[in-house]
Amino acid sequence: MSVSTHLYAPEGMGRRPAAFLRLVFAIMLAVTVASARAVNAPPLPQRVIELAPNLKVQGGGELTFFGISVYDGYYWSPARGWAQDGPFALDLHYHRALDGAKIAERSVGEITRLGYGTAEQRSRWGDEMKRVFPDVRRGDRITGVNLPGGVVRYFLNGNSIGDIADPGFARAFFGIWLDPKSSQLDFRQLLLGEKP
């Protein structure tokens, strides 16, 4: 007795079941990889833990630009969601070298697109970011920590590199990734743990 099995593709797929199954498998693998990133987030630097000891990773993922990997990001918070006034951290692990001034300029562009602040405030925030943001190399890690009172403290590879103290700036800066109108909605969902 012989048993024969056939794979049938959905209506309209013709005779391409193997291609269909490969596509389904690739999608499942991509979702698994994205989920694993959040679970396997590297621990926060010790100095960050000392500032905000109750943070837990909520999600994470990879940000790409036209298919080029820019960085892996992780969102750390005591609870789910974006608690704008509470302590939280955004931890970025860079895959490529980037100029600190260009990072600041891109950030101002995103803040402007989101509608935060006045032109004068955005200009001041841009100057502050240029003062604090270093050039990054592949493998560098920048962690931004939102502290009570609207202070954002930045760390490069675990070492403090500067603060920007302005509640409006804190909301605007973290809004680049966490605002519901972010230009990177898929990445936002990964950071907040809303997308597996």
Model-derived features with residue positions:
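N-terminal secretory signal peptides that target proteins for export/translocation
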Residues: 1-19
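Short, intrinsically disordered low-complexity segments
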Residues: 14-15, 21, 36, 187
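Bacterial N-terminal signal peptides
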Residues: 22-32
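Terminal leader/tail segments of proteins
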Residues: 36-196
